[in-house]
Amino acid sequence: MHIPSRQTEKQEAFLYNYDMIGNQMVNAGALHQMLKPYKAHLITGHTHYNLNVVFDENLMEHNTAAVCGTWWKADICLDGTPRGYGIYEVNDNDVKWYYKSSGYPKEHQFRSYPVGASKEHPSDIIANVWNWDKLWKVEWLEDGQLMGNMTRYTGLDPYASVVCSDREKMVYTW
């Protein structure tokens, strides 16, 4: 599908909101109900960022970032994910996936930032792990030594903030 069914786990009734109408389906509840008896993965796009939503044990949505980055204006997407595409490997009921950044090897799965790089969390080391989902565990290692688990938060990627705030570069002529 192109437009995401929902961007949160919470199953709320559709509410007309002009700013959000392009990011959700009017009939997402009916679609999710129809898929309830099956183990299903929805693959969507449209938003130019990665977002995985686990609705329940049988239904997950993968909103995959764009191969065009920020509408061909930058090599990254709005969430800091490099432009690229999703790879999905299906073997019977077993589904595995990862995000493949264009021009990088498969192993290129995150960007890290030192203390002070984030305005939102200036005293923290930040890792933007593209295609993350809530079933993953993200750990901080330094020189091969486990330093601890990282805490998830939703915020701005420092590099994407710089790139996307350049108004002259991001002007669209369409």
Please report, for each region that a protein language model flagged, where it lies by residue.
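A composition-driven signal for long, intrinsically disordered, charge-rich low-complexity tracts
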Residues: 40, 127-129, 152
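Binuclear metal-dependent phosphoesterase catalytic core
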Residues: 59-143, 173
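Solvent-exposed serine/threonine-rich low-complexity stretches and specific carbohydrate-binding patches
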Residues: 146-171
